[in-house]
């Protein structure tokens, strides 16, 4: 019986660890979504700014700088999107492990009662 209790305790600790991991991943994904949204707004801002700047108003290099900034923001959006996909995969894996562990724990308790 002591072996079952020790294993049950280890299972509970592992379950708590996975639950915390899942929550941390969820927070990271929400943070990435905010970053994606912020950078998409910056892209729109720079597009609008680029429409108003004319060559007779300023030098052509300003357009190059703006385009460079826009490309940088687009790259960031892509990077955050990829990171979000990776986090989502980790979260799904943690959920699957938690379900398996919960099922195994229930089976262990069921066998211990016999």
UniProtKB/Swiss-Prot annotation:
State the InterPro entries in the record: DUF496 (IPR007458)
Q: Where in the cell is it found?
A: Cytoplasm
Q: What is its main location?
A: cytoplasm
Q: Which domain of life is it from?
A: Bacteria
Where are the membrane-spanning stretches? none
Query: Pfam families given for it?
Result: DUF496
Is rRNA processing given among the entry's keywords? no
Query: Keywords, A to Z?
Result: Coiled coil, Cytoplasm
Instruction: Extract the ranges annotated as region (Disordered).
Output: 89-114
**GO CC list:** cytosol
| Recorded coiled-coil stretches | 70-111
Family membership, please give it. Answer: Belongs to the pole-localizer TmaR family.
Q: What task does this protein carry out?
A: Pole-localizer protein involved in the regulation of several cellular processes.
Q: What is this protein called?
A: Pole-localizer protein TmaR
Q: Which organism is it from?
A: Haemophilus influenzae (strain ATCC 51907 / DSM 11121 / KW20 / Rd)
């Amino acid at each position: 019986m002591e072996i079952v209790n020790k294993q049950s305790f280890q299972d509970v600790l592992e379950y708590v660890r996975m639950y915390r991991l899942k929550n941390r991943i969820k927070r990271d994904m929400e943070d990435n979504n905010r970053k994606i949204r912020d950078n998409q707004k910056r892209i729109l801002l720079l597009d609008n700014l680029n429409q108003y700047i004319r060559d007779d108003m300023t030098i052509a290099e300003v357009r190059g700088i703006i385009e460079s900034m826009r490309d940088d923001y687009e790259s960031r959006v892509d990077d955050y999107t990829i990171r979000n996909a990776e986090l989502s995969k980790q979260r799904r894996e943690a959920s699957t492990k938690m379900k398996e562990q919960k099922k195994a724990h229930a089976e262990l308790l069921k066998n211990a009662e016999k």
